[in-house]
């Protein structure tokens, strides 16, 4: 009888799982951008319009540095935060602003300071804005890099015959997916935290990169802004696991002379699933997340680049 009861319970659970399993819709329809939507790519290979040097008279410029979050992976060019800030500042301040985007997917902090030094200042920036993502301190030996490689290998592995048979069960798939996601998330959290340990070589280099960028900007009288993005594949409320890392980066950037914009508070009341390109398949910020970021960044500009004085009446 016990065996029969167990079998019946499993069958009921299987049926319930199949009935209740939806398509995982979040209420947000992702905008799937193809290769043609990655345009424009300018003559220097950046995802940007052609920007002339030296800076034309009457133009104000942000030079934007970062990785795929700043480049705008998964969103249209006009939806990425640099272009949104460009439009917002031009409209709100009555000035001609350009956001020169020198970002590139996969760049880390050390590479970003090199690009600023070798190319960025040639555009005559009125402000330098660095989009900081938590993997900017990563190197090839990082635990998170190893976890990501392991995940990619696991996803590409062909299941065996027994595993394929069991995978036909919705209940088995559900349990396995939940267990796998829990274990992977624990590895992910541990991996990112290890990348900000005081003795971790990648963080030491990234910290020094912030100091160097701050010094380069200070020597030229150019304001430096560091924008800290959260990792969106996590609850963005009190359960967010990387708040201490945000604080550590903010302290380092502030000590380097930067105006810090931590975006985490801006996303606190938003379901993270509404902020990503395509759920767990692509956790880059979508156009909603870019819009929220641009609003926060544009507000911060008043602190570092004063608005033009209102014309006096005769």
PLM regions and their residue ranges:
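Hydrophobic membrane-insertion alpha-helices, especially the h-region
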Residues: 1-15
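Histidine-centered active-site loop/cap adjacent to the catalytic His
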Residues: 12, 17, 259, 279-314
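Generic structural signal for small/hydrophobic residues in well-ordered secondary structure
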Residues: 14, 67, 112, 128, ...
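Membrane/wall-proximal cationic-aromatic binding patches
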Residues: 15-93, 116, 267-271, 277-280, ...
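Conserved SGNH/GDSL esterase-like catalytic core that processes O-acyl groups on lipids
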Residues: 61-63, 69-160
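Soluble non-cytosolic domains of exported or imported proteins
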Residues: 75-80, 106-110, 200-207, 240-243, ...
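Extracytoplasmic/secreted envelope proteins and their assembly/folding machinery
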Residues: 82, 86, 113-117, 207-210, ...
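Serine-dependent acyl-ester chemistry module
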Residues: 133-251, 255-258, 263-274, 298, ...
């Amino acid at each position: 009888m016990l065996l029969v009861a167990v079998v019946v319970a499993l069958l009921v659970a299987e049926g319930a799982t199949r009935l209740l399993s939806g398509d995982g819709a979040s209420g947000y329809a992702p905008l799937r951008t193809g290769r043609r939507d990655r345009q424009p790519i300018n003559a220097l290979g950046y995802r940007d319009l052609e920007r002339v040097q030296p800076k034309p008279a009457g133009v104000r410029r942000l030079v934007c540095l970062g990785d795929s979050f700043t480049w705008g992976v998964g969103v249209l060019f006009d939806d990425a935060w640099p272009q949104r800030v460009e439009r917002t500042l031009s409209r709100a301040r009555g000035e001609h602003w350009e956001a020169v985007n020198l970002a590139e997917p996969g760049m880390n902090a050390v590479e970003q300071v090199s690009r600023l030094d070798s190319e960025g200042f040639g555009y005559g920036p009125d402000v330098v804005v660095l989009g900081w993502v938590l993997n900017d301190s990563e190197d090839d030996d990082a635990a998170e890099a190893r976890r990501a490689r392991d995940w990619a290998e696991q996803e590409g592995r062909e299941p065996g015959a027994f595993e394929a048979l069991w995978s036909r069960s919705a209940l088995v798939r559900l349990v396995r997916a939940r267990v796998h996601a829990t274990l992977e998330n624990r590895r992910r959290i541990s991996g990112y935290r290890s990348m900000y340990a005081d003795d971790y070589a990648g963080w030491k280099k990234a910290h020094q990169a912030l100091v160097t960028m701050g010094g380069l900007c200070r020597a030229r009288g150019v304001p430096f802004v560091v924008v800290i993005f959260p990792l969106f594949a996590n609850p963005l409320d009190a359960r967010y696991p990387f708040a201490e890392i945000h604080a550590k980066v903010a302290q380092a950037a502030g000590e380097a002379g930067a105006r810090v914009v931590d975006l985490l508070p801006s996303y606190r009341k938003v379901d993270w699933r509404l902020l990503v390109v395509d759920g767990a398949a692509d956790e880059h910020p979508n156009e909603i997340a870019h819009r929220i970021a641009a609003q926060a960044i544009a507000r911060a500009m008043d602190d570092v680049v004063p608005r033009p004085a209102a014309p006096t009446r005769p």
